[in-house]
Each structure stands twice: as structure tokens, then as C-alpha cells.
Curated annotation (Swiss-Prot):
Keyword hit for DNA-binding: yes
GO BP: any one term: regulation of DNA-templated transcription
Family matches, as Gene3D superfamilies: 6.10.140.140, Classic Zinc Finger (3.30.160.60)
Task performed by this protein: May be involved in transcriptional regulation.
Gene name of the encoded protein: Zfp120
Lineage: Eukaryota, Metazoa, Chordata, Craniata, Vertebrata
Domain KRAB intervals: 28-115
Organism annotation: Mus musculus
Highest taxon of source: Eukaryota
Family membership noted in the UniProt record: Belongs to the krueppel C2H2-type zinc-finger protein family.
Protein name, entry field: Zinc finger protein 120
Tissue specificity note: Widely expressed with highest levels in kidney, brain, and liver, and the lowest levels in spleen.
Main location: nucleus
PANTHER family: EXPRESSED SEQUENCE AW146154-RELATED, ZINC FINGER PROTEIN
Cell compartments where the protein resides: Nucleus
């Protein structure tokens, strides 16, 4: 049976074949209106189809109850889903929870308030015909439910945000997003959820259950969605593309992180020094200067680092090694990030855009300097001569003549200079002397 058959299931007297039964002319049974799947059929449905099936059946029972049918002593929740439990399906959505309100009714229900309409079940009279699938229904309310499925009618509207839903149970579930109600609580850690299915997924964290296996590498996952994301590593699928630079990602979360390059957003701030970072990894790396001993020391200048990788990058400043070469102009760089910035000169990419005037820049530091035009801020102004140096590094270099610091020393005569460019100019004097 396909899910389509469920949508078109007759709500009254399915299985009577238009013929009256001798002993129970005034009875329609529970089995007449509910539909069971075999395990093979159920396995073909995805979770959203299963949820939709349950909601359609729930809506069927509600409409029957509303027009005068009733049950006695028949637990619909157990009866309707008994096959699913028997076949090992342990998931149970909040839609199923809603069926509990019908659990104290009889399997057989009698029609009380509309005997004429009830007689149509056995006479075969079906005055309303469904246009799309030619399904006949015994009364107009049944036809309306069928039509709602075909045209996706959404009569249940949220009075807070106006969002509409095809089923009342969907509306009730949605309303929890406004009220903050979380009726499903984990009995191990106390965390609460708005949906029963979300609680079930959460409980797997405690049980360690990993039901979803990758058929290529055997890796297991707690959630089906995690398995789907993992599979992209095998097929190379990257469905999430940046609309500014075109770079694609396998996960939406990775795309959101990438977009910070364009927006300049830095949500991770160091509580000790106030420095902000676009990535959490950058903040964690930065924190090591406060919490971790710097074990890796440069044997040439004595500078120490928390990570061995940082030491290796630093050593290139002494050796002059530049392993990252631009394949367009051949210029080489000591850091990969420097190569990436350089390549924007060739591509013309300017990912950093000013939110106030729309001007774009190839470097984030250039955007920051530009934004000061709008704000009037001068954070890199020299406190002694009031010169605006534009960036922090330039300010530190500028301050050296004021403080008398001379970091760059000539190895021939010992003379010191505040800037490396001055040292290079000075060295030419020694070179000229050697020629004479």
C-alpha cells in the first residue's frame, strides 16, 4: 500500500461493499476506518510520511467523533499502532500521544445523531465524488478531508504569527514555540523538549544507541540526519553555497561560519583582553597564552609558543622559507593565509563589505580602517603626537621613536634602528665602503 492510498481511505464503511450486514445493520467497526501497513510497506516510508499518515488517521477519528460516533473500551492508541510495536518500531511521535484522548472508546461505535446519513453506508449511496482519485465518500465532511489532502488546505492558523497548518495537531505542536512549553522531559538529565520525537533522539545520548550505520565505512550515528551529512564526505556533495563568493560546503553550519568572513562578525571574545574572533577555535588557541605553558621556544630569538606548529611558522621568518606560491604570478609566502589574501588581487574578490555605504575590501583590516570614517573612531592614534596610524601594528612601530626602542641592530657596527627599513638603508653604507 502506498501512502497515497492512506490519504484516500474512505472514512465510513470501507469494506462493506455497499451490502448490509445481517446482524449489525447499525454498527460500523473500528477496522472499517483504520488502515494497517505490513512491515515491508511501512519500511518504505520516511519519517515525515509516517507522521503524516498518523495525522491523517487522527483527523479521521476526530471527524468521526465530531459527527456522533463513539467507541467503548477500545484503546485506539494501542490498537492502531500495535503492528508498529510488534515489528520493532520503537519511535512514537507526539501525534501518537494525541490519540490517548480516544483510548476509552469501544471498538464498535454506533451512529446516533444522523441515521439518514448512516444508512448511506449500507445502501451504497455516495453523493459526493472526489475529482482527483474518483474516491466516493458517504458524506460531505469526508470529501472535505480528502480535498484538503490533495490541495494542501491549511485551515488551522496560529493566532500569534499567522502560520497555517493542515492539521490541528501540527498547530498545537507549533504553538509551543510561542509559549515555550516543553512537556517531554528526560528522566536522566532533566532536559525538556517540545516534541516527543526530540526527547527520543536525545535519550540516545544516554543509552549510547547508534542505530544508523554508514554502508561504506561502517561508522555509526545516533541520528539519521547525522548519517546523511556524513555520507556527503563519500560522494563529495556540497549543497550549501555562499551567495557572495560561490564557495560550497557539505554542512549548513560550515556555511554560516564561512559567512563571517564577509560580514566581519566575531562572536567569540576573550574575557581577559577583549580580543574577538570569528571562530571558536581561534579563541581557544588564543586562550593558551593565558592558561598553557609555552614549551616551544625559538633557538634563534628565544620567542616561545604554545604550539609546535606556531613555532614552525615563526622559524620561516628566520630562514626565509616561503612554501606557499601564487600560481598566477609566482609570488611566495610564508603562510597560507597570506597567500589567500594575495590571491584576491588576481580574482578581484572583495568579501568584506561596509554595511553603511556598501564599499567592499579585500582585507578585513581595510574594512575596519574604513569604518572609522563613519564612526569617527581613532583607536590607533598616538597618545604623544596624535597621529592616526591606521592599525595596531603601525602604531607600535610609530611609537618607537618616542620611546627610544631600537629593535633592529646592525650586525657590523652595532647601531640600532626603530624600523627594519632604516636598518636596510644603513646597511648600504657598509656595502658602499667595501667597494672603495
Amino acid at each position: 500500500m502506498f501512502l497515497l492510498d492512506v490519504f484516500c481511505v474512505p472514512l465510513l464503511g470501507a469494506g462493506t461493499s455497499g451490502k448490509p450486514r445481517s446482524s449489525d445493520m447499525d454498527i460500523v467497526t473500528y477496522d472499517d476506518v483504520h488502515v494497517n501497513f505490513t512491515w515491508e510497506e511501512w519500511a518504505l516510508l520516511d519519517p515525515s510520511q509516517k507522521d503524516l499518515y498518523r495525522d491523517v488517521m487522527l483527523e479521521t477519528y476526530r471527524n468521526l467523533a465530531a459527527i456522533g460516533y463513539y467507541w467503548k473500551g477500545h484503546n485506539i492508541s494501542e490498537g492502531h499502532f500495535q503492528n508498529s510495536r510488534r515489528n520493532g518500531r520503537h519511535e512514537r511521535s507526539d501525534t501518537e500521544e494525541k490519540l490517548s484522548e480516544f483510548t476509552q472508546y469501544d471498538k464498535d461505535f454506533a451512529y446516533q445523531s444522523h441515521p439518514q446519513r448512516h444508512e448511506r453506508i449500507y445502501s451504497g449511496e455516495k453523493p459526493y465524488e472526489g475529482v482527483q482519485y474518483f474516491e466516493d465518500f458517504a458524506h460531505h465532511s469526508s470529501l472535505q478531508i480528502q480535498r484538503r489532502t490533495h490541495v494542501v488546505e491549511k485551515p488551522y492558523e496560529c493566532n500569534q504569527c499567522g502560520k497555517a497548518f493542515a492539521y490541528h495537531s501540527y498547530l498545537q505542536r507549533h504553538e509551543r514555540s510561542h509559549t515555550g512549553e516543553k512537556p517531554y522531559e528526560c528522566n536522566q538529565c532533566g532536559k525538556a523538549f517540545g516534541r516527543h520525537s526530540h526527547l527520543q533522539r536525545h535519550e540516545r545520548i544516554h543509552t549510547g544507541e547508534k542505530s544508523y550505520d554508514c554502508n561504506q565505512c561502517g561508522k555509526t550515528f545516533v541520528h539519521h540526519s547525522h548519517l546523511q551529512i556524513h555520507k556527503r564526505t563519500h560522494i563529495g556533495e556540497k549543497p550549501f553555497e555562499c551567495n557572495q563568493c560561490g564557495k560550497a560546503f557539505a554542512r549548513n553550519s560550515h556555511l554560516l561560519i564561512h559567512k563571517r568572513i564577509h560580514t566581519g562578525e566575531k562572536p567569540y571574545e576573550c574575557k581577559q583582553c577583549g580580543k574577538a574572533f570569528a571562530y571558536q577555535s581561534g579563541l581557544l588557541y588564543h586562550k593558551r597564552r593565558y592558561t598553557v605553558e609555552k614549551l616551544y621556544e625559538c633557538n634563534q630569538c628565544g620567542k616561545a609558543f604554545a604550539c609546535h606548529n606556531s613555532l614552525q611558522v615563526h622559524k620561516r621568518t628566520h630562514t626565509g622559507e616561503k612554501p606557499y606560491k601564487c600560481n598566477q604570478c609566482g609570488k611566495a609566502f610564508g603562510r597560507y593565509s597570506s597567500l589567500q589574501r594575495h590571491e584576491r588581487i588576481h580574482t578581484g574578490e572583495k568579501p568584506y563589505e561596509c554595511k553603511q555605504c556598501g564599499k567592499a575590501f579585500g582585507r578585513h583590516s581595510s574594512l575596519q580602517r574604513h569604518e572609522r570614517i563613519h564612526t569617527g573612531q581613532k583607536p590607533d592614534e598616538c597618545s604623544q603626537c596624535c597621529k592616526d596610524c591606521g592599525c595596531y601594528n603601525s602604531l607600535q612601530i610609530h611609537k618607537r621613536p618616542h620611546t627610544g626602542e631600537k629593535y633592529f641592530e646592525c650586525n657590523q657596527c652595532g647601531k640600532g634602528f626603530s624600523q627594519n627599513c632604516y636598518l636596510e638603508i644603513h646597511k648600504r653604507a657598509h656595502t658602499v665602503e667595501k667597494h672603495y
